[in-house]
């Protein structure tokens, strides 16, 4: 990792200024709060890998201005131009008060927290695609502007969050990607966006942990369903072992699984796999 204030750091693009780490610490680190440390580095391979390898307390936050080997679900790698987004990982330790089988809600919780924060702070509608994608609308089409990756690290979970903030069309890694800028966001200053994201994450995590991880009791399950663009859609679930399942996404159950109603009248829960939103033939797309 290279510290953000190290000699040779690349701050040549004035349209993409560096994060103000001291100001972020002053705003977010407080006695009795969740966040215990916040480090900003100029570049690293993966903030999730670095934070998982470090033996630190709950509430550690690691932010990178650039990642060279960021990972998504199924170990897919991705990258983005320096200072073009929010790339961070946080360490969460639910403790004995939350049964381990409920820890699977953490990436969904992070999605709710991130989507709600971006909708408020950036002024752009941000939706969720089950289980861990952040969607925005660009030129009338759904585009992925970010994602969540949660990994177990001892008695903790490291949750990685990536959001494309200022990427231009010619910088997108794939045609289905998007960014807050391309979605017409009213604010692209990453400092207030990061503050809003971490405050939202703290609020949701504190409520979830206080409810013993019960997603219904803390209204997380309700909030996820309300913000999930997958529900009510006909989707194709691409499952392990080259299997596929097509059906209408009708619910997210108490275990965080996506429930599909198939054409045979059965309801099938899906706990892992890629979800493809299928458009009706009449849409012309």
Model-derived regions: residue spans:
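Short loop/edge segments at beta-strand edges and connector loops
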Residues: 42, 128-130
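Long, positively charged amphipathic alpha-helical accessory segments at protein N-termini or as interdomain linkers
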Residues: 2-16, 95-126, 136-285
């Amino acid at each position: 990792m290279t510290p953000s204030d190290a000699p040779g750091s690349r701050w040549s693009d004035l349209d993409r200024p560096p994060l103000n780490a001291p100001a972020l610490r002053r705003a977010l680190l407080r006695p009795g709060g969740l966040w215990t440390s916040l480090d900003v580095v100029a570049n690293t391979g993966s903030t999730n890998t670095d934070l998982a390898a470090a033996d630190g307390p709950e509430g550690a936050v690691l932010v990178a201005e650039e990642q060279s080997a960021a990972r998504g679900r199924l170990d897919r790698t991705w990258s983005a131009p320096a200072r073009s987004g929010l790339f961070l990982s946080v360490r969460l330790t639910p403790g004995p008060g939350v049964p381990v089988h409920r820890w699977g809600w953490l990436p969904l919780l992070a999605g709710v927290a991130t989507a709600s924060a971006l909708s408020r702070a950036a002024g752009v509608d941000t939706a969720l695609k089950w289980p861990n994608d952040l969607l925005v609308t660009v030129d009338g089409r759904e585009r992925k502007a970010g994602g969540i990756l949660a990994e177990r690290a001892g008695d903790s979970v490291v949750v990685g969050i990536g959001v494309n903030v200022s990427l231009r069309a010619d910088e997108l890694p794939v045609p289905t990607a998007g960014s807050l800028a391309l979605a017409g966001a009213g604010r692209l200053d990453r400092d207030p966006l990061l503050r809003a994201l971490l405050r939202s994450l703290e609020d949701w995590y504190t409520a979830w942990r206080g409810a013993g991880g019960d997603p219904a009791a803390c209204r997380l399950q309700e909030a996820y369903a309300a913000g999930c663009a997958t529900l009510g859609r006909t989707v194709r679930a691409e499952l392990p072992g080259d299997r596929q399942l097509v059906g209408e996404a009708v619910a997210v159950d108490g275990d965080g699984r996506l429930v599909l109603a198939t054409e045979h009248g059965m309801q099938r829960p899906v706990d892992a796999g890629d979800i493809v939103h299928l458009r009706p033939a009449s849409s012309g797309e």
